Each structure stands twice: as structure tokens, then as C-alpha cells.
Amino acid sequence: MAASAPPPPDKLEGGGGPAPPPAPPSTGRKQGKAGLQMKSPEKKRRKSNTQGPAYSHLTEFAPPPTPMVDHLVASNPFEDDFGAPKVGVAAPPFLGSPVPFGGFRVQGGMAGQVPPGYSTGGGGGPQPLRRQPPPFPPNPMGPAFNMPPQGPGYPPPGNMNFPSQPFNQPLGQNFSPPSGQMMPGPVGGFGPMISPTMGQPPRAELGPPSLSQRFAQPGAPFGPSPLQRPGQGLPSLPPNTSPFPGPDPGFPGPGGEDGGKPLNPPASTAFPQEPHSGSPAAAVNGNQPSFPPNSSGRGGGTPDANSLAPPGKAGGGSGPQPPPGLVYPCGACRSEVNDDQDAILCEASCQKWFHRECTGMTESAYGLLTTEASAVWACDLCLKTKEIQSVYIREGMGQLVAANDG
């Protein structure tokens, strides 16, 4: 028998001390035993050093707080749900979870309704909740998200008229109607949990109608009101805007009837009321019915302060009501006096219209004259050729009467 060679030095490097001296020559059996005795402690020590941390890691951190995919097997939802201590520990995080489905997943009755990967309680619950929220809307809360119901107990989608509300309003208002309606259904186990905190079953019927009423009622005021307001405003605008002075709104009706008649009297007859009628004071104090309608036409043409004097000129016939063939020449330049031009009526005597530029009056003076209701203007020709009273008094009907005559 040949003697066995000593063990190679690489197998003996694991020890801390120097390699032992070679064994004295002996039989092969003794040398083999010595080799085994020398190698076995090293192998055990080596294995314990390499594999020990792995075992300790698994035992110390199992189940890990944030399990990975390979550790999901350790947190079985069915085992966790039926374990009394684990359910108690997992209930607080789920009840306080801001996610709308947190409260539902603690119930044990949910295990049969939802796939195992989605209804988890206990230690590993929060992770599936965080990683797998999308499957929940169709399963437990289908109606609330406007999705087809998954169980016989869920209310039809038609009753849930607020698909967008769960995201815009507090959970209490959105989920309470579903909870009230789902109590007799397969998710009846959740009723006791939801009803104490946010259970208001009447809202299941009141919520959708309130939405429809809320949209229907605003529609009613918004729809009719724009139509009514313009309708109400239109009738009020003509009387307010057409006669500038303000007391004239009563006269446009009669004026419309008599508008064609007094076209010639202002030029042919010179009784004091017609001269006065052209002045702004005539419109303020109340004049013959025929003139306010004309003033309304004039007022519409020039909505400035200057329009107060032209009303009298419009009473002469240049308003929209008189025939278009009439022309009112300026007393100075003999050109036509248009509605859009500043014009002054000689109320004192000749009853002729004059352009403001032809009389040499400034805009500021013209504004003061037209805004003064009791002012009476006379042209230069009448002042030179006629005796014009310096003071005139307007009577109740707005007629001009000389102070010395009265």
C-alpha cells in the first residue's frame, strides 16, 4: 500500500496559525484520519462564515417592512386576514389611510370579493395598496367612478350621477351614498365601518337630485334672466335716452302722433311757446307734445350736452319723423343745419337755427348755454333790428313771456 500524500496547503489556509508539520510516516489509514480531522474544522468554520449572515438576515428581517416581489409569498392575504393579532395591527393604518379604499380592505368579508393580491391586511397590506390601486376602482367602487358594477348589490350607475365628485369633494360626501346603497350587497360588511364616520344614506337619493337641481336652477335664472333683462332694459332705454331732459318721456307717444303737424308752425307762427319749445328749458319744464318726440330724435343723434339745444331744432322738423324734403338753413351762412352739428336756436325772435361756428360762440359757452335750462338765446340780427327783452319768464307750460309784459 502506498502512503497517502499530505493534504494540499490550500485547504489548510483557513486556519489562523501556521500549517502543522507533516505527519510522521505511518499507515495510510492513520494519515487519512489525520487529514480528515484537520480538514473538517476548517470546512465548518468556512461555511459558518459565508452562510451565517444570510440566515441571520432572513430571520432578522422577515417579513421585511417593505417586501419586494420575491417576498410577497410571505404575506398571504388570507392568512393575515384570519390572524386576529395581525388584523388588529393593520386596522389603524388602513382606517387612517387617506386612500378611499383603505377602510374596506381590513374587513375579512372582502377576501372573497377581491383577488388575493388586492385585498390585503396585516403587515404587508400597505404595499399592495400603494403599488396596486388601479384595480380597485372597477372592483369595490365601480359605481362611484362611473364604471359598471361588479356585484349584484351595487346600485346601477344611473343612480350615481356624480362620477367626477369623488375627486373634487371630500370623501364623506362622495362615498356615503355608495355605502348606504351597498350595505345589502356583497360589500355589506363595509356598511358598519363607513356609516359611523361618513354614513348618510339619505344623500344616496338627495345627492344626485341636488346636482341636477343645482345645474337646472342656475340654468333657469341664467337663461331667462338675460332675456328678461334686455327685454326690461330695452323699453326703459328709449324713454330715458331719447328725451334728454328727463321729464319728456311722457310726450313721445303724443309727439309721434303730432310730429308731422307742427312742422310748419314753428316757421310760420311765432307765438312764444314755440320759440321756447326749442330751448332746453322747454324740454325740462314741459312743452307741447309735438316737440319732445323731435327732441328724442335729436337726443339720439347727439348724446352730448349739446343735444339739449338741437331738440328744439329737431322740433322744427329735422328729426327722423318729419318728411325728408325739409331743409333748415343756417340764419348766417344759409347752409343746412344737420343734426350732428352744434346749432343754436334764436328763441327770442326769429326762430332760426344758426351754426355755432357762424355765431362765433366757443364750445365752452355753447355747453353752458345748452346746459342752462332757463337760458334764452337771440341772434345778432334780432338784437340789432328788434327790441329783445333782456329777461324772459317761463310759465307753467314752458312758454316764454317777457318780464315787462307779465
From Swiss-Prot:
CDD domains linked to this entry: PHD_PYGO2 (cd15636)
UniProt main location, coarse: nucleus
Segments of skewed composition (Pro residues): 131-141, 149-158, 236-252
GO biological process: brain development; canonical Wnt signaling pathway; developmental growth; kidney development; lens development in camera-type eye; mammary gland development; regulation of mammary gland epithelial cell proliferation; roof of mouth development
GO terms of molecular function: chromatin binding; histone acetyltransferase regulator activity; histone binding; zinc ion binding
Residue positions, PTM Phosphothreonine: T302
Segments forming PHD-type zinc fingers: 327-385
Location(s) in or outside the cell: Nucleus
InterPro entries, alphabetized: Wnt_Signal_Transd_Protein, Zinc_finger_PHD-type_CS, Znf_FYVE_PHD, Znf_PHD, Znf_PHD-finger, Znf_RING/FYVE/PHD
SUPFAM superfamilies per the UniProt record, alphabetical: FYVE/PHD zinc finger
Entry keyword annotation includes Nucleus: yes
A UniProt-annotated Pfam family: PHD
Modified residues (N-acetylalanine): A2
Residue ranges of the motif Nuclear localization signal: 41-47
Assembly with partners or alone: Binds to BCL9 via the PHD-type zinc finger motif, and thereby becomes part of the nuclear beta-catenin/TCF complex.
Protein name: Pygopus homolog 2
